[in-house]
Amino acid sequence: TEMQAACGLAQMDKLDSFIQARKDNFKYLRDRLKSCEEFLILPEATENSDPSWFGFLITVKPEANIRRVDLLKYLDQYKIGTRLLFAGNLTRQPYMRGRNYRVSGELSNTDVVMNDSFWIGVYPGLTKEMLDFVIKKIEEFFGVNF
């Protein structure tokens, strides 16, 4: 509708600040969660890229001996929102049963994403205090820096 278009156009004026806030939040999480790299694979930008981050993707390392679900339940206790990555290994989805398809390789990385990865937010409205709370709870879960 015209009203939705007007709202969208008004948001366009704020786009650069939204993108910068997402980048700043991503960098803040990345820098501060280095304390947990023994347990987690943290995201990083592809060389020569300049992403506007959707979220902060975290992967629990297999050698951490921690199940993703346990970390997610812990974060949920503190009202920290998380989301699973969209698909992971599509060949493991119920829809694919009984269908003919071709696979190139073992798809082991897609299994890792499906089983061990999740997002936390980098929404532009998050404050440093909010991000610090998320970081503190992740560090507490792993027994780091507290």
What kind of region is each of these model predictions?
Residues 1-146:
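PLP-dependent aminotransferase class I/II
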